[in-house]
């Protein structure tokens, strides 16, 4: 699978209309993914602010159609470089940027670059001379793990121009979790109502045989045609990034990240419609098994409490648990690295609805208009 084929795939992904997205079986999961990115960027900005930077220079590497442009606006970015191998996606990102309400006044500067970040030197194309304060790579880095050279080039492009103390954040499939799922499935396949994961070479799945690079799998969500992806073991990602003086700040499976962000990010999660109300007459999952946790939560609620919870169907939750979030920082000194802990998969936590709004919600969250036209996972 060459980067050109990846580009071809993403260039041809149809832009779903608002109505299509609302009717999608994974409507809430997509919104949840989008909320996770918002929370991650929010946390990264706190670290960037600690460096004394209020208006960061940002690189959004493998930015797709620019689904995070609004988030960059909210961070108060000074300049954002958006790079992707898919030219049509970059064109759409640039068009979106131009329709943003403040354009061309009072909005961050931006550069849109078409580049295969596994082969080309991005630095040759970047116009701004300042180093980056923040780099974001959402749902994309693993494509570069097709082979070692590609992964190394991609990571160099990602963090090579990051300033000392600068932050690198991202999301990617959790290789351990995926291998676990396909090993426990049938003939290298894991499937539920919303996602299907197939590991291509089943004989590689025996203990110790999954290669570090080129471990190809197919991940299809909501029956969308997918393009092949590659496992990126987090310990390997960490190792490769350490060669660029990057130190690990955190890594969490999505389940763990959601639990951590539920209190500070609850208001935003509700406004972004990241949870489905249970019970309701038009649930996206069609069997009782999809909502056993939510049902148990409802049954445990005392009297005089509204009998509604916010939840995700079991299948969406299983799919979301296939991903992790991470944050690294370029070392300022020779501080000792923080060690990553093995991510533990928690159960879906249904959230009682109609309670007082969380007071600690970030003021930025109120400003997000949830009209995102391209929520991830794309
Ligand atoms: C799942 S999409 C994520 C898009 C965006 N980051 C988001 O969160 O919505 C993966 C993106 O990675 C891009 N990509 C894959 N391989 C790439 C490469 N070699 N160089 C640059 N971009 C690449 C694809 O074109 C696609 O836009």
From Swiss-Prot:
GO terms for biological process: 7-methylguanosine mRNA capping. Its main location: nucleus. Keywords: Methyltransferase, mRNA capping, mRNA processing, Nucleus, RNA-binding, S-adenosyl-L-methionine, Transferase. Residues 24-331 form the mRNA cap 0 methyltransferase domain. It is found in: Nucleus. Its EC number is 2.1.1.56. One of its GO terms (molecular function) is RNA binding. MRNA binds at residues 33-34. InterPro entries: mRNA_G-N7_MeTrfase_dom, mRNA_G-N7_MeTrfase_euk, RG7MT1, SAM-dependent_MTases_sf. Gene3D superfamilies: Vaccinia Virus protein VP39 (3.40.50.150). Residues 335-378 are annotated as: Disordered. Residues 335-347, 356-378 have a biased composition (Basic and acidic residues). CDD domains: AdoMet_MTases. The record marks 65, 71, 96, 142, 229, 323 as: mRNA cap binding. It holds the Pfam family mRNA_G-N7_MeTrfase. S-adenosyl-L-methionine binds at residues 37, 62, 84, 116, 138, 143. It catalyses: a 5'-end (5'-triphosphoguanosine)-ribonucleoside in mRNA + S-adenosyl-L-methionine = a 5'-end (N(7)-methyl 5'-triphosphoguanosine)-ribonucleoside in mRNA + S-adenosyl-L-homocysteine. Transmembrane segments: none annotated. The keyword S-adenosyl-L-methionine applies. One of its GO terms (cellular component) is nucleus. Belongs to the class I-like SAM-binding methyltransferase superfamily. mRNA cap 0 methyltransferase family. mRNA-capping methyltransferase that methylates the N7 position of the added guanosine to the 5'-cap structure of mRNAs. Binds RNA containing 5'-terminal GpppC. This is mRNA cap guanine-N(7) methyltransferase. It comes from Caenorhabditis briggsae.
